[in-house]
């Protein structure tokens, strides 16, 4: 089996997990990596003045790139995981080669769905994942005891990175719906993982969720940039609490036939993101994208 080394900047983080799902050998030495899985804003700032880096930067971000345009290096070997990231970087003159989606490695515990809702996420700097909203809204409907919160806010039942893969999928499969209410996602892996076991997302229909999820969408009512300080400015979307209440009520009163149809639909959609047995060859993916572009211009 081919060994591909992937640089990630952290250990208990989604980038580390992504590298494992893609079948890569993790390294924290950027000069030794063939692929760099990182937030592109942070990567292009961190290595702004270092020339001898040759990895393919495969990134996704929730930062507003416009706010960092004068701090970022030009980097040709750069792909993103979502189309909204692609458009954002293209607008500031740092055009990625293409979009290459992330992948999942689902497990399928044989358990009944004995919970209503689940959410999973780690909010940093501010509650970007809307974990507190999940806690509050499920209490409002008196279903907090039928809700699983995995995270670091919102009175979580489990810490984000404390679970094994089997434990995580055991929680996914127990829930009927995934509350994907994050204000911004560069890609949005957890609800796709949940879809693989038939758990239906109730999701904010924006950012990475809009292009990757299916289920019960809630359209955004506002879009803006939130700066928590001079160094951290995020592109965020807001949802209507009224529409959220409507969809939760819809979920609570949904017929068995409607739910089973939706569950089958989301499970089928998730198969688009399944990882292969071999380490993911991002160079092959880039070659295929180039051929598709060439055919489109003929």
Regions found by a protein language model. Name each.
Residues 170-175:
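Short alpha-helical donor nucleotide-sugar binding micro-motif in glycosyltransferases
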Residues 106, 113-158, 163-165:
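Conserved catalytic-core segment of nucleotide-activated headgroup transferases in glycan assembly
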Residues 76-88, 93-108:
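Donor nucleotide-sugar binding/catalytic pocket of nucleotide-sugar-dependent glycosyltransferases
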Residues 235-246, 253-288:
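A charged, aromatic-enriched C-terminal amphipathic alpha-helix characteristic of glycosyltransferases
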Residues 183:
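Aromatic "clamp/platform" in nucleotide-sugar-dependent glycosyltransferases that forms part
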